Curated annotation (Swiss-Prot):
Molecular function, one GO term: threonine-tRNA ligase activity
Matches recorded under PANTHER family: THREONINE--TRNA LIGASE, CHLOROPLASTIC_MITOCHONDRIAL 2, THREONINE-TRNA LIGASE
Role played: Catalyzes the attachment of threonine to tRNA(Thr) in a two-step reaction: L-threonine is first activated by ATP to form Thr-AMP and then transferred to the acceptor end of tRNA(Thr). Also edits incorrectly charged L-seryl-tRNA(Thr).
Protein known as: Threonine--tRNA ligase
Main location: cytoplasm
Keywords from the UniProt entry: Aminoacyl-tRNA synthetase, ATP-binding, Cytoplasm, Ligase, Metal-binding, Nucleotide-binding, Protein biosynthesis, RNA-binding, tRNA-binding, Zinc
The reaction(s) this protein catalyses: tRNA(Thr) + L-threonine + ATP = L-threonyl-tRNA(Thr) + AMP + diphosphate + H(+)
Length: 668
């Protein structure tokens, strides 16, 4: 064994330590305060226990301020919760307890399932365990010992987990005082480092290993954060998210509904369909100059999906259909017995359109766009309003270009995506490049070239944004058929939504034999770029509803203005106001009911009407209007003509407004 090991620190300095030194030893050599605040170490990027011996490499000391500490806090909180449950209900079996987004859960085998009333008791016991500050210590057990000990404790699920661990792999046991669990780790130094910024959120049922043929377990979800302020912010965000839930607002605003006969497909009501069409119309205008809109069939022979690879890679997520006649009349030799599939993606259809007719390099790039209805199977339990459906519309486009055109096309797509997001009020955008996964098609040379181009594009995006756009790399997260950019936007309450993608595809052009004639009169395979901006139009609409809490921008709102009268004497003038607004292009309804004006205003506010114009005897005499805005107590009095002009301008989509302003500037 070497007499010394050499560690490189984040500042570039290199120090030697005796062989056998642990992460804690390294932290203590720097300062006692660092050793006290340290929760783990990272060697060459891999997070490890503080008690682990270190080897040559790059070392980082992880404290609670480090983003990586959050996963450790949540992981340890799950273990503390499991110990608390077994102290409160002896005989309960623990199964698995992973970290998930924003928290953790643990599944338990218990005779009687947990109820929400149990959660405060468990939280109290967890705080007791945390206060004990018991150290986390790691042991390596043999398979035989682990099975024997867990079997003796009646932990049958743990025995099954031990059996599932591959032979030759270490079996790690982590102790926290007298309690222990089978776990890969890593963990922090002690239960005390979990802190008290946690909350148990809910109970649920879950099948063992997610299989409905297995036993039903009792699951407890929790969340944990580095400090109380972060926990409070998260809980506030959840409360806001509940108020903004698009399913609730969709009912209140009479936009859409779902029902059992069509699980995961939307029944659009008139107002909801208006929003959807406004979104499609806007996107269609943005594509009018550079793209050719096409439409590929929704139902295609599975032979095509076999060629594309979807039938092999994606079959479980597809809907297959066969004619009822062929199924009920097998004796009919003329019947079409083929199996067809509803398209889950638009790309194979677009390749067929590209292939139809010889293409020259002079015609490239060819950009094909479609608002294509696609269908993908999702388990019933995964369906979630507009956010997770089985039938949805993709704002899909596919660009066929030369290798040399790839960078320019990616930048052009980026400009369009960012401009669209900005028009909808999204300012905080993150663009990340996902690179080659282990399992992939295409040669290393192809990947090298594509990743080099996209890395340069990412640098250009960052430079052009002057810091407004954050960028990053997701190693190994690319699709099997090519690297991609992922666009994530942040909404009004801080949630992140991954929407846009720019995806290079080495697979489909080769599978379908797509080519163009290059400058040497040779057949050459084009570069194919998949592009989506909203992604699922339904999901994007759901994001908009939640981002604006139903108070959509006037140009997207399905009902833009309600004209309400105070007295029947103003009804004739109210009709005149409504007609003037309609002539200016606004969606308007009138409310001349014999109800008090405050009642009318409250009622229309619930349905999120953005503008209510109130007309009484005074307004009729003076030919003015009283404007009330959703969410504001202010009342603005304006002349009718000025009000119509102002609201018409506000209701003009931003892209149309820009064109008008540019035309005006040219004429000046």
């Amino acid at each position: 064994m070497s007499e010394a090991i050499f560690l490189t620190f984040p500042d570039g300095s290199v120090r030697s330590f005796p062989a056998g030194a642990t992460g804690r030893d390294v932290a203590e050599s720097i300062s006692k305060s660092l050793a006290k605040s340290a929760v783990a170490i990272a060697i060459d990027g891999t997070v490890q226990d503080l008690s682990d011996t270190v080897a040559d490499g790059k070392i980082e000391i992880i404290t609670r301020k480090d983003g990586r500490a959050l996963e450790l806090i949540r992981h340890d909180a799950a273990h503390v919760m499991a110990e608390a449950v077994q102290e409160l209900w002896p005989g309960t079996q623990v199964t698995i307890g992973p970290v998930i987004e924003n928290g953790f859960y643990y599944d338990f085998a218990k005779n009687e399932p947990f109820t929400p009333d149990d959660l405060p008791k468990i939280e109290k016991k967890m705080k007791e365990i945390i206060a004990r500050n018991a150290p986390f210590t790691k042991q390596i057990w043999s398979r035989e010992k682990a099975k024997e000990v867990f079997a003796a404790k009646g932990e049958n699920y743990k025995v099954e987990l031990v059996d599932a661990i591959p032979a030759g792999q270490d079996l790690k046991i982590y102790n926290q005082g007298d309690w222990f669990d089978l776990c890969r780790g890593p963990h922090m130094a002690s239960t005390g480092q979990v802190g008290t910024a946690f909350k148990l959120m809910k109970v649920a049922g879950a099948y063992w290993r997610g299989d409905s043929n297995n036993a039903m377990l009792s699951r407890i979800y929790g969340t944990a954060w580095a400090d109380q302020a972060d926990l409070d912010n998260y809980l506030h965000m959840l409360a806001e998210a509940e108020k903004r839930d698009h399913r609730k607002l969709g009912r209140e605003m009479d936009l859409f509904h779902f029902q059992e006969e069509g699980p995961g497909v939307v029944f659009w009501h008139g107002k909801g369909w208006r929003i959807f069409q406004a979104l499609v119309s806007y996107m269609r205008r943005r594509l009018a100059v550079d793209y050719e809109e096409v439409n590929a069939p929704q139902v295609l022979d599975t032979a095509l999906w076999e060629t594309s690879g979807h039938w092999g890679w994606y079959q479980e997520n597809m809907f297959a259909v066969k004619s009822a006649h062929a199924m009920t009349h097998p004796e009919d030799k003329e019947a079409d017995n083929r199996v067809f599939a509803l398209k889950p993606m638009n790309c194979p259809g677009h390749v067929q359109i590209f292939k139809h007719g010889l293409k020259s390099y002079r015609e490239l790039p060819i950009r094909l766009a479609e608002f294509g209805l696609v269908h993908r199977y999702e388990p019933s339990g995964a369906l979630h309003g507009l956010m997770r459906v089985r039938g949805f519309t993709q704002d899909d486009a596919h660009i066929f270009c030369t290798d040399e055109q790839m960078a320019a096309e990616c930048l052009k797509i980026n400009d369009l995506i960012l401009s669209v997001y900005e028009d909808f009020g999204f300012k905080e955008i993150v663009v990340k490049l996902s690179t080659r996964p282990e399992k992939r098609v295409g040669s290393d040379a192809l990947w090298d070239r594509a990743e080099a181009v996209m890395t340069d594009v990412l640098k250009t995006i960052e430079a052009q944004s002057e810091g407004r756009i954050k960028t990053g790399i997701l190693p190994g997260e690319g699709a099997f058929y090519g690297p991609k950019f992922e666009y994530t936007l942040k909404d009004a309450i801080g949630r992140e939504w991954q929407c846009g993608t720019t995806q290079v595809d080495f697979n489909l052009p080769e599978r379908f034999g797509a080519f163009y004639i290059d400058s040497n009169s040779e057949k050459t395979q084009p570069v194919m770029i998949h592009r989506a901006i909203c992604g699922s139009m339904e999901r994007f609409l759901g994001i908009l509803i939640e981002n604006f809490a139903g108070h959509l921008p006037l140009w997207v709102s399905p009902l833009q203005v309600v004209v309400a009268t105070i007295t029947s004497e103003a009804d004739a003038y109210g009709l005149e106001v409504a007609e003037a607004l309609r002539e200016a292009g606004l969606n308007v309804e009138t409310d001349f009911r014999n109800e008090k004006i405050n009642y009318k205003v409250r009622e229309h506010s619930v349905t999120k009407v953005p503008v209510i114009i109130v007309c009484g005897r005074k307004e009729a005499e003076e030919r003015t209007v009283n404007i009330r805005r959703l969410g504001s107590q202010d009342q603005v009095s304006m002349g009718l003509d000025a009000a119509v002009d102002s609201l018409a301008l506000e209701a003009t989509p931003p892209d149309v407004r820009r064109k008008a302003e540019a035309k005006k500037a040219r004429a000046a």
